[in-house]
Swiss-Prot record:
Molecular functions (GO terms): manganese ion transmembrane transporter activity
InterPro entries documented for this protein: Mntp/YtaF, Put_MntP
Cysteines joined through disulfide linkages: none
GO cellular component, one term: plasma membrane
Protein's job: Probably functions as a manganese efflux pump.
Keyword set includes Transport: yes
A UniProt-annotated Pfam family: Mntp
Spans traversing the lipid bilayer: 6-26, 33-53, 63-83, 101-121, 130-150
Cell compartments where the protein resides: Cell membrane
Keyword Transport: yes
Species per Swiss-Prot/TrEMBL record: Desulforudis audaxviator (strain MP104C)
Protein's UniProt name: Putative manganese efflux pump MntP
Membrane topology: Multi-pass membrane protein
Length: 180
């Protein structure tokens, strides 16, 4: 997998976190809680691809090239899912979630990081460089999340939806690239 592909993939994975953080930031999420959430997003965007990578590497040895097809199908599915969700009406984030504390933030971070587990599986089947790729995914997701909080007071609500739509289209493209 090329560096450009890894960056595109990392950006696509970071769009869910960006959208969440933008929505929370627009609703007055406190700075301390915002930085805790960003840290959790970074951690999960590094750990989950590593876990998925090991599962994908094992599967790649077990079933060979078919594992790459499965990985491409997973990326394609995730991309379509993200596009559909970005077009759905009535999705909102709320700053009231702060009351849930650290556990609530962990659940929020996990909700936007689970796609990274599936992507890690795909990386394992493709034989991608594990630590570098997971680090890039975590760094990009963290930067996108932090940027969303910083920019939240300057942007309109429509940006979050379009970011998720773009991320879904990128995942579809990466999935198709793995097939061909």
């Amino acid at each position: 997998m090329t560096a450009g592909t890894v960056l595109l993939l990392a950006g696509a994975l970071g769009t869910d976190a960006f959208s969440l953080c933008l929505g929370l930031g627009l609703n007055g999420f406190r700075r301390r809680m915002a930085w805790m959430l960003v840290g959790l997003i970074v951690a999960l965007h590094v750990v989950l691809p590593v876990a998925g990578w090991y599962a994908g590497e094992f599967t790649g040895r077990l079933v060979g090239r078919w594992a790459a097809y499965l990985g491409a199908a997973i990326l394609f599915y995730l991309g379509v899912k993200m596009v559909r969700e970005s077009l759905a009406e009535g999705r909102t984030a709320t700053g009231k979630l702060e009351r849930a504390g650290f556990l609530g933030l962990t659940v929020l971070a996990g909700s936007v990081s689970m796609d990274a587990l599936s992507v890690g599986f795909t990386l394992g089947t493709a034989g991608a460089a594990l630590l570098l790729t997971a680090g890039v995914i975590g760094l990009v997701a963290g930067l996108m999340s932090a940027a969303a909080f910083v920019l939240a007071h300057r942007v309109e609500d429509w940006v979050g939806r379009r970011a998720e739509l773009l991320g879904g289209l990128v995942l579809i493209g990466v999935g198709l690239r793995l097939l061909f």
